[in-house]
Regions:
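RNA pseudouridine synthases
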Residues: 1-404
Length: 404
């Protein structure tokens, strides 16, 4: 359960910001905590802070134990062991990162037919809501994001819905949300069984294979994948690198992956191609990595485009070793050395400031650069192969003929 939220939203420099707020959460204690002191539990479960920090927070009431509906006083907590049915109550000062503002506050506040919270509605009935997600905002609460997420914004407008699949924060496009668990389960089952045809659009570097064969007109986008001679298939495995986790856990196993690509239009002035992407499997960053390995990365991809990447060591590894387990020269020690390079370059990109919140002493983060909150990758079409539904969005501006 969560209480104490008083949310103040404002916009600044193209960003939607939430002022820091207090949030109180409560939950029953875990079985492994029984018979232990609260201070010992906090130190062992949350190792980022020293013991002295948690002692101070207990005295301030940040952490409380509720027993039989009555909170125990701080001094009592220092000597009382945790019992079954106790409730741990935690009060935190939340600092949410800003997101890209997709519309004015006035438009966000006023819902109209075909629009909710400033998001364009593609389709809606009693079971599902389909919207055109803007880039730069997470779909659901994750990490530091909570209020600045699509599902929480929809709740403020009277719609409690579950996302049926994942779209990254910086990816735009078609998002299907279910209004009940049964509808969510049915759609997710279709995706898992590959009964769902998904087509994305990406704007990539260079002249993509077979793009010389396409007709440069608006109708070209409507005939994707019809001519098999224009299809490029990438089948290299996909794995993830998570520098926030230690090696070897932060380097996942390689998994088979398939993506089909089809050129839609070529912008000769920019030497860039708009490509339709059909992922057959659903690995994390699959389309972005496959395009990078083909030598045609997404134009503004700050991770996988070599021209602008902030993570050159990670990109070099992923493109050089499609299946890292097959490389005999990559023993455990060499992998550990390389992984440390991934960690170092991630730390170098951390946008921290030298100011601290006076209330909770959290280090302030710099505002993100607006261009870092947009990726020219767009979920364009979703179609259930048995004909239950077929949805698509308008073309994003960067894919339109007059946006060369």
């Amino acid at each position: 359960m969560s209480t104490l939220k008083v949310i103040e939203v404002y916009t600044q420099n193209g960003l939607r910001k939430v002022r820091p707020y207090y949030n109180r959460r409560s939950a029953f204690v875990k079985g492994r905590w029984l018979g232990k002191l609260l201070i010992d539990v906090l130190v062992s479960e949350f190792k980022l802070r020293p013991r002295a920090y948690y002692l101070d927070q207990i005295r301030k009431g940040t952490y409380r134990l509720i027993r039989d509906g009555v909170p125990l006083v701080p001094d009592h907590l220092m000597t009382t062991i945790i019992k079954n049915h106790d409730v741990l109550e935690t009060t935190t000062h939340k600092h949410e990162p800003p997101v890209k503002q997709w519309c004015s506050q006035e438009v966000e506040a006023e819902d109209l037919p075909g629009r909710i919270a400033g998001f364009n509605i593609i389709f809606e009935n009693e079971s599902i809501l389909v919207i055109d997600k803007p880039s730069g905002i997470p779909v659901h609460p994750t990490g530091q994001f909570y209020q600045n997420t699509i599902t929480e914004l929809l709740k403020l407008h009277g719609v409690d819905a579950l996302p049926c699949y994942r779209l990254d924060k910086i990816t735009s496009g078609l998002l299907i949300l279910a209004k009940n668990s049964q509808s969510a389960g049915e759609i997710q089952k279709s995706i898992r069984s590959r009964d769902m045809i998904k087509i994305y659009l990406a704007r990539v570097k260079g002249r993509f294979p077979h793009s010389e064969l396409i007709l440069d007109n608006e109708s070209a986008a409507e005939t994707t994948f019809e001519d098999t001679s224009k299809v490029t298939v990438e089948m290299t495995p996909i794995y993830s690198i998570d520098p926030k986790r230690q090696f070897p856990v932060g380097l996942s196993a390689s998994k088979d992956a398939i993506t089909k690509f089809y050129p839609i239009r070529y912008f000769s002035h920019a030497d860039e191609t708009v490509v339709a992407c059909k992922p057959i499997t659903g690995r994390t960053h699959q389309i972005r990595i496959h395009l990078a390995r083909l030598g045609h990365p997404i134009v503004n991809d700050s991770v996988y485009c070599s021209h602008i990447t902030k993570y050159p060591e990670r990109l070099k590894f992923i493109t050089q070793f499609p299946r890292w387990e097959d490389q005999q020269d990559l023993d455990a020690e060499e992998l550990k050395v390389r992984f440390q390079k991934f960690v170092d370059e991630t730390k170098n990109n951390c946008r921290t400031m030298k100011t601290f919140c006076p209330e909770c002493h959290t280090v302030d983060l710099r505002d993100p650069v607006l261009s870092d909150l947009e990726l020219w990758l767009h979920a364009w079409k979703y179609e259930e192969i048995n004909g239950k539904f077929k949805f698509k969005t308008d073309l994003p501006k960067w894919a339109q003929l007059d946006n060369s």
